[in-house]
A protein has these predicted regions:
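N-terminal Rossmann-like FAD-binding beta1-loop-alpha1 element of flavoenzymes
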Residues: 2-29
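Short loop/edge segments at beta-strand edges and connector loops
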Residues: 8, 79-81, 219-221
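Conserved Rossmann-like nucleotide-cofactor binding loop
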Residues: 12, 35, 255
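Glycine-rich FAD pyrophosphate-binding loop
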Residues: 21-45
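Mid-domain catalytic core of redox enzymes
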Residues: 23, 222-346
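Short glycine/proline- and charge-enriched loop/turn segments
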Residues: 43-51, 184-187, 266
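Dinucleotide-binding Rossmann-like beta1-alpha1 core, especially the glycine-rich loop
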Residues: 46-130, 135-138, 142, 155
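Active-site/ligand-binding neighborhood in enzyme catalytic cores
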Residues: 107, 116-226, 251
């Protein structure tokens, strides 16, 4: 039996701890905050329980289906027909199907057809290997052309990746387009899923299953340092003392790893430090009426500093479909850690 410490109780940490506990290991899960779940945790938004960050499920998320079944919550999965929009030229356009693409006035007909080629190639491709060494700009330009990249992708990349927009991997954009592109009921109808009760349903099931398997969840207990001896983990230091450990799984952001494990070889520290990170500040609005009929709206309008909005209640009903009910809209604002706003306080 391995004494394992998992650091971070977001969905990844919870799932790793749950798997390890069910495999018979002695697992302690550390969480710096006072609730488990990370970005999947819910909070009370003026009487409404809602997740900190939006989540959705696609029809090809087979590992998720397997996990839901093992947790006994597969019956909480719901599917809904959703749509996309695109805001540009001061107008909201339909998006996400062949007819909408052909009707879109913001590109030449040839560019619209080539945009469709990028989408088609992405949804049909099964392997990412050859894309790992290509930038998204190179790949999209090769298949879609300069007009497609400059008008449709570059504005989104600039707002999401800033200085990293140009070298971002083609494998990233392919994975994203493929996942959404294959989650369809038909060529003309997108189909996305959610959990009844929100992501809290998954968080609660993982935490309860972890505890029943003998796991120990310690909230408000940050990991301060991973101790090693002879190149092997011996424990994790917390404000309450040291927890003996034979192995550690960290789900903390990679820039924190070198500080967390001071005995790491210098070349490993350099590898972790070299990984660029981008943060996100996600605003959540609770409104009395719907903003658009769409779940997701991409924005390529000059002067608008966000790449899109997510009208979450158009996927998971939270009162937005009833008269006088609530509409929940997430507005993500991305920024690299070098951005001046990244250093602002939460207040």
């Amino acid at each position: 039996m391995t004494r394992l410490v998992v650091i971070g109780s977001g969905a990844m940490g919870l799932a790793a701890a749950w798997e390890a506990a069910h495999a018979g290991h002695d697992v302690t899960l550390l969480e710096a905050g006072n609730v488990a779940g990370g970005m999947a945790a819910h909070f009370d938004f003026d009487g409404l329980s809602i997740e900190r960050f939006y989540h959705f499920i696609c029809t090809t998320d087979f590992a998720t289906f397997k996990l839901l079944g093992e947790l006994g919550i597969a019956d909480s999965l719901r599917w809904r027909a959703t749509t996309m929009g695109h805001f540009s030229g001061g107008r909201l356009h339909e998006w996400g199907n062949p007819v909408a693409l052909l009707r879109y006035p913001g590109m030449s007909l040839w560019a619209r057809l080539r945009y469709g080629v990028v989408e088609f190639v992405s949804t049909r491709r099964d392997r990412w290997d050859a894309l790992e060494t290509q930038s998204a700009r190179e790949w999209i330009t090769r298949w879609g052309g300069t007009e497609v990249y400059d008008k449709m992708w570059k504005p989104l990349f600039d707002l999401k990746f800033y200085d990293y927009a140009d070298p971002i991997s083609a494998a990233w954009i392919w994975t994203r387009v493929k996942r959404i592109g294959r989650s369809r009921k038909s060529l003309f109808e997108e189909k996305l899923g959610y959990l009844e009760g929100g992501s809290e349903t998954l968080v609660t099931a993982l935490a309860d299953g972890f505890a029943k398997a003998g796991g120990k969840l310690r909230l408000s207990t940050p990991a301060l340092r991973v101790e090693t001896e002879g190149g092997r983990v011996t424990g994790v230091v917390t404000p309450e003392g040291t927890i003996a450990a034979d192995a550690v799984i960290s789900t903390m952001p990679t820039p924190l790893v070198a500080k967390l494990v001071p005995d790491l070889p210098e070349d490993w520290k350099a590898r972790y430090d070299a990984i660029a990170n981008i943060g996100v500040c996600c605003l959540i609005f609770k409104l009395g009426r719907s903003v658009t009929p769409h779940f997701w709206v991409n924005i390529t309008e000059p002067g608008v500093p966000v790449p899109g909005i997510i009208e979450f209640s158009n996927l998971r009903p939270v009162g937005g479909n009833t008269p006088g009910g609530d509409t929940i809209v997430y507005v993500p604002y991305y920024m690299p850690v070098t951005h001046e706003k990244f250093g602002w306080s939460d207040d």
